[in-house]
A protein has these predicted regions:
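Post-signal peptide N-terminal segment of secreted/secretory-pathway proteins
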Residues: 59-184
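Repeated scaffold domains used in trafficking and secretory/extracellular systems
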Residues: 88-101, 141-157, 221-234, 289-302, ...
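Bacterial Sec-dependent N-terminal signal peptides
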Residues: 1-48
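Short, conserved, GDST-rich strand-edge loop motifs in beta-rich repeat architectures
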Residues: 52-61, 165-192, 240-266, 312-314, ...
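Acidic, serine/threonine- and glycine-rich low-complexity intrinsically disordered segments
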Residues: 208-372
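Loop/turn-rich, solvent-exposed surfaces of beta-rich toroidal or solenoidal domains
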Residues: 346-422
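Beta-propeller blade signature
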Residues: 63-73, 121-128, 181-205, 257-277, ...
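Beta-propeller fold detector
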Residues: 76-89, 130-144, 193, 198-222, ...
Length: 457
């Protein structure tokens, strides 16, 4: 029997006051028993499923983001079936919304991406099903970081979000005092100006904004390197530094044209004082190479006093890097996913650790088959302390299982919730008990043509 969910506006005030969070109907019963044992326990939490609808091409996610919430007991029940695309709430965004949630799942935060409403921040009280009640007023941050801001919440008790952008200038050229003679011109550097805004998530207010020109070393700049993209701000354990991941690009100093055939440098992170957002410095890993800006999902997390950060486009396969309390990379910590998973070209697409230092990682690798939207994705269970990783074989992997746009995991104690489903195919919620590796197949997720699920919140 599949149980199909109705609108959660049917919840009574009494049920809400008791923290009981379910309202569903059964296919073979029209009379609801008020003592139904399926009523969840008082320690239940909301699990919000997000789906990205196809725009033009399968898996592009440009047709809008749909969200739908159920309680954690029903999320674990494979007889439950939900249809976010048919019954869900449309999260405001011109393209795929970039969502965040409170730690307890009771609030969804959204900043619209691109279009006329790009940069508009809204938050919603999660009330079950497709009922998301807007809280407070909108605030628009586009005047600070543009209409396509890259933002995440900071792990400070759901108080603050941070959004960033980078503006790359035209290459600086020294004309040697002869502006009409280009034969003696010398390339100097390409300036990248970053902007960072912090947002009061509780009161929908701008907290701070700063811009900086962030230099690399003189040698790196002379060779044409510059920050071309930044993302994924993360607080250190002390709460006095903000780490921002970055991607480097390069121009050919002899022509100032874009150079795609270059040596990939050690992974870099921009460090700012917090909350002032002043005094930018750059730190460099001697272990990992490539980018640290991630894509759609939070890319760095504080655990046990240090920040653990994934990198991407590493010639040796993705690493999980460690930044210690001294705000420098710990180059004695070497955790390489190629080695741990026995694959080539591992690429971390998204990940999330539990409080025990064990995490679920979404990844692809060089031998991933090419699906309808891109390379096939997988999930692995990793241990940050032991530096081990194991593919989670209990989750099915269709060739069209596409995780490049994956955003959300829910951590509930030592359990991590995730979504599975190939592009255009039905899937399920899965729950990984990180202590034991046990995997539970949960609620069915009904899909539509060309669309895919991008996580839970």
């Amino acid at each position: 029997m599949k149980r199909n969910f109705l609108n959660y506006k049917l919840l009574t005030g009494i049920a809400l006051s008791m923290g009981l969070m379910t309202a569903c109907s059964s296919d073979d019963s029209t009379n609801e028993d008020p003592t139904d044992p399926e009523v969840p326990a008082v320690d239940s939490r909301w699990i919000t499923v997000a789906g990205a609808k196809m725009g033009t091409n399968p898996g592009d996610g440009n047709g809008g983001t749909y969200i739908y919430s159920i309680n954690s007991e029903d999320a674990k029940d494979p007889t439950v079936s939900i249809d976010p695309f048919e019954n869900g709430f449309i999260a405001p965004s011109n393209r795929t919304a970039r969502l965040q949630s409170s730690e307890d799942g009771s609030t969804i935060f959204n900043i619209s991406y691109a279009g006329d409403t790009g940069g508009n921040y809204t938050k919603y009280d999660v009330q079950g099903g497709n009922t998301f009640q807007q809280l407070g007023t909108d605030v628009n941050i586009s005047q600070y970081v543009g209409t396509a801001p890259r933002w995440v919440k900071l792990f400070d008790g759901d108080q603050t979000g941070a959004a960033v952008y980078v503006n790359v200038a035209e290459p600086t050229i020294d004309d040697n005092g002869t502006p009409d003679d280009i034969s003696d011109d010398t390339y100097v550097r390409t300036d990248a100006t970053i902007g960072v805004v912090t947002l009061d998530l509780e009161n929908s207010l701008i907290k701070n904004f700063e811009e900086h020109s962030v230099p690399l070393s003189a040698e790196e700049e002379a060779n044409g390197y510059y920050f071309s993209r930044i993302d994924m701000p993360t607080l250190n354990a002390a709460g006095d530094k903000l780490y921002i991941g970055g991607r480097l690009s390069k121009v050919d100093p002899t022509t100032t044209e874009s150079d795609s055939d270059y040596t990939i440098l050690g992974s870099k992170t921009i460090v700012l004082d917090y909350p002032s957002l002043l005094n930018p410095t750059v730190i460099t890993s001697a272990v990992g190479h490539g980018n640290t800006n991630g894509y759609r999902s939070i890319n760095a997390f504080e655990y046990n006093g240090s920040v653990y950060q994934a990198n991407q486009s590493d010639p040796e396969g993705s690493h999980i890097l460690k930044i210690d309390a001294n705000n420098q990379y710990d180059d004695s910590y070497d955790f390489n996913l190629d080695d741990a998973l026995n694959v080539n070209g591992a690429y971390i697409l998204a990940w999330r650790p539990a409080s025990n230092g064990k995490a679920v990682v979404a990844y692809r690798h060089d031998d991933s088959v090419e699906g309808v939207a891109g390379a096939q994705g997988f999930f692995a269970l990793v241990d940050l302390n032991a530096k081990t990783a194991q593919k989670i074989d209990a989750i099915p992997y269709d060739p069209d299982f596409y995780l490049f746009q994956y955003q959300g995991f829910v951590v509930d104690g030592t359990e991590i919730y995730l979504t599975q489903g190939a592009v255009g195919e039905n899937g399920n919620i899965y729950i990984v008990e990180t202590e034991t590796g046990e995997v539970t197949k949960g609620a069915e997720l009904v899909n539509i043509e060309g669309s895919h699920f991008i996580g839970v919140f």
